[in-house]
Swiss-Prot record:
Transmembrane segments: none annotated. The gene is dtd. A motif (Gly-cisPro motif, important for rejection of L-amino acids) lies at residues 137-138. The keyword Transferase does not apply. Gene3D superfamilies: D-tyrosyl-tRNA(Tyr) deacylase (3.50.80.10). This is D-aminoacyl-tRNA deacylase. It holds the Pfam family Tyr_Deacylase. HAMAP family: Deacylase_Dtd (MF_00518). Belongs to the DTD family.
Length: 146
């Protein structure tokens, strides 16, 4: 599993002109599921992302997690994160999980985040989405489960 996480002041996702998920301050998580991912990868990433101390404390140091701040998490599926662009001019997506497996693990990740007591919103799996965000920092990380 590969995730791009961005600290945001706010973020939303729109499908067919309708907002399907939004948060205030917190994290936007773009999540890609690989073909060899398992339930343990979803749990690992959910724990890592929600515990990562990337929010500033009163001294201005990155010392607080999204759990500590009470922020929200917006999770958006993005299989293109698994693209291999090393050869040729067209990305290869053979490392990405097939849709049924990817959706199941995406939902497992979302559930694991919710189980940590965080306000959690999502996009629509497999849909064309418009994602809006106001970066905070900007602070952006790429995290992998393997």
């Amino acid at each position: 599993m590969r995730a791009v996480i961005q600290r945001v002041q706010k973020s939303s996702v729109t499908v067919d002109g309708h907002v399907v998920g939004s948060i205030g301050p917190g994290l936007l998580v773009l999540l890609g599921v690989a073909g060899n991912d398992e339930q343990k990868d979803a749990e690992f990433l959910a724990n890592k992302i929600t515990s990562l101390r990337i929010f500033e404390d009163d001294a201005g140091k990155m010392n607080r997690s999204v759990i500590d701040t009470g922020g929200g998490v917006l999770v958006v599926s993005q299989f293109t994160l698994l693209a291999d662009c090393r050869k040729g001019r067209r990305p290869s997506f053979v490392q990405a999980a097939e849709p049924r497996k990817a959706e199941a693990l995406y939902l497992a990740f979302v559930e694991a985040v919710k189980n940590r007591g965080l306000t959690t919103a999502t996009g629509t799996f497999g849909a064309m989405m418009d994602v809006s965000l106001v970066n905070d920092g900007p602070v952006t990380f790429v995290i992998e489960s393997q």
